[in-house]
């Protein structure tokens, strides 16, 4: 059986923002703060990886002949 459906970027950001809010309150027990921090780091990496993937996709545009070419902002 496959693992849970992969979290979207938006879902990960929302969860990360929630963790940051909890940690900023300052009344979180140390053990919970460490667990929140670890989860936040995982979510941060997930978001970073998704952004890198999108960035790589945007580096290329499809020509009329179907050939992928690097995107140049000057051509836009």
Swiss-Prot record:
<dbReference type="GO" id="GO:0008855">
    <property type="term" value="F:exodeoxyribonuclease VII activity"/>
</dbReference>
<comment type="subunit">
    <text>Heterooligomer composed of large and small subunits.</text>
</comment>
<protein>
    <recommendedName>
        <fullName>Exodeoxyribonuclease 7 small subunit</fullName>
        <ecNumber>3.1.11.6</ecNumber>
    </recommendedName>
</protein>
<dbReference type="GO" id="GO:0005829">
    <property type="term" value="C:cytosol"/>
</dbReference>
<keyword id="KW-0540">Nuclease</keyword>
<comment type="similarity">
    <text>Belongs to the XseB family.</text>
</comment>
<dbReference type="Pfam" id="PF02609">
    <property type="entry name" value="Exonuc_VII_S"/>
</dbReference>
<dbReference type="GO" id="GO:0009318">
    <property type="term" value="C:exodeoxyribonuclease VII complex"/>
</dbReference>
<dbReference type="InterPro" id="IPR003761">
    <property type="entry name" value="Exonuc_VII_S"/>
</dbReference>
<keyword id="KW-0269">Exonuclease</keyword>
<comment type="function">
    <text>Bidirectionally degrades single-stranded DNA into large acid-insoluble oligonucleotides, which are then degraded further into small acid-soluble oligonucleotides.</text>
</comment>
<keyword id="KW-0378">Hydrolase</keyword>
<dbReference type="GO" id="GO:0006308">
    <property type="term" value="P:DNA catabolic process"/>
</dbReference>
<dbReference type="InterPro" id="IPR037004">
    <property type="entry name" value="Exonuc_VII_ssu_sf"/>
</dbReference>
<keyword id="KW-0963">Cytoplasm</keyword>
């Amino acid at each position: 059986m496959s693992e849970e459906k992969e979290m979207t970027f938006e879902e990960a950001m929302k969860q990360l923002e929630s963790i940051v809010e909890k940690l900023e309150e300052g009344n979180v027990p140390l053990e919970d703060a460490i667990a929140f921090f670890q989860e936040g780091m995982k979510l941060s990496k997930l978001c970073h990886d998704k952004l890198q993937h999108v960035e790589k996709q945007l580096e290329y545009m499809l020509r009329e002949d179907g050939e992928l070419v690097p995107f140049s902002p000057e051509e836009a």
